[in-house]
Amino acid sequence: MEVKTFLKRALKEDLGHGDLFERVLEKDFKATAFVRAKQEGVFSGEKYALELLQMTGIECVQTIKDKERFKPKDTLMEIKGDFSMLLKVERTLLNLLQHSSGIATLTSRFVEALNSHKVRLLDTRKTRPLLRIFEKYSVLNGGASNHRLGLDDALMLKDTHLRHVKDLKSFLTHARKNLPFTAKIEIECESFEEAKNAMKAGADIVMCDNLSVLETKEIAAYRDTHYPFVLLEASGNISLESISAYAKSGVDAISVGALIHQATFIDMHMKMA
C-alpha cells in the first residue's frame, strides 16, 4: 500500500468524523510536543512519521534517525503545530513509532544473537494484513533482510504444493520455462532425503524446515560436496537461544517469522511543552 494512502487510512481510523475535543476547544494555539522513550530500543518509523506530520501541517523540529538506539527518557522527536492537530495525530504517530520500533528492536536482538556476518537473517510473509510493507521496512531498520514480499517474488514450493507434484525434476523444468528469467525456485524440505531430492531436481534454494541443528548440518555438508551453488535456508521455530547454533550449521540464511509476529510495542509517550 502506498505510504500516503496507508497514513490517511490510519488517521481516519482514529479520527472518525472528527475529534470531539476540537468542538469544545475555545481557541486554538501553537504548541510544542515531545515524543519520548519509556524503554530502550532501536528507532524505526521515521519515514512514516515525517510523512504523517507533513500531511497534517505539523513541523518536525528534530528527530532521531531510523536504526538509532535510544534509552528511557530520550527525546525521539520534537514537533510543533496547532494544539488541536497535535492531539489529533498523537495516537496514530505513537502507534506507528511504537510498532515499527518494536519490530526493529526485536530484530536487532536476533542479529546480535546470530553473531555472524556470513549468514543472513530474513523475515517471512507472516505479517499483519495490509501492513506487510510497513513491517518489513521495520525489519530492515533492525538490521535483517527481507524474504519474499509476495507470491510474485519467487516460486516457493511447500508441502501443500508438493503433494500434487508427481515428478519434481520434470515440474521444475516446466516451471523454468514459464517463470521470469530472474525468478528463483525454493523448495521447503522436512528431511535429509527431501533436501537431497530438491537439489537433484534443480532447486535454487533449499529450505530446511523445522529440522534440528544436526540434521541441518548434514544437509549443508551434502550440499557443499555435491551442489555448492545451491543456497540453504534454515527456518521453523528458531529462537534467540538457538539461532547461533543454526548459524554455525552451514546455511546461508535463517528466516524467522517471530521478528514480526512476536514483536511488542516499544513504550513511548508524547508530552506537551
Regions found by a protein language model. Give the residues of each.
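Structured functional modules or segments
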Residues: 234-235, 240
